[in-house]
Amino acid sequence: MAFGKKPDFKKKPAQNPLFKRKRYCRFTVAGVEQIDYKDVDTLKDFIGENAKITPARLTGTKAKYQRQLDTAIKRARYLALLPFSDQHKK
């Protein structure tokens, strides 16, 4: 019977081999008011391997701080504190 009732298969929750932690905003926890472009060590944590800014949905950063982070990274790149791309490493 091609149009008969399908058997009930219970779906198992997808088991992710990597443990995902709950994301939280590091700047809210630390009580940061303004993100400084001169704090290069903090900014490097929010830049991926290919020198792209990591989105807030992956880092857990709130929208207010993500905008400040975006501006701070762009200023640091303009002042040559951070690289624009990873091409120069080759």
Curated annotation (Swiss-Prot):
Keyword entries, A-Z: Ribonucleoprotein, Ribosomal protein, RNA-binding, rRNA-binding
Superkingdom of source: Bacteria
CC terms in the record's Gene Ontology section: cytosolic small ribosomal subunit
Pfam family, one: Ribosomal_S18
Protein's UniProt keywords contain Ribonucleoprotein: yes
Signal peptide coordinates: none
Keyword Ubl conjugation: no
A molecular function (GO) term: small ribosomal subunit rRNA binding
GO biological process: translation
Family statement drawn from the similarity comment of this UniProt entry: Belongs to the bacterial ribosomal protein bS18 family.
HAMAP family per record: Ribosomal_bS18
Function (record text): Binds as a heterodimer with protein bS6 to the central domain of the 16S rRNA, where it helps stabilize the platform of the 30S subunit.
Subunit structure: Part of the 30S ribosomal subunit. Forms a tight heterodimer with protein bS6.
Protein name, as recorded: Small ribosomal subunit protein bS18
Gene: rpsR
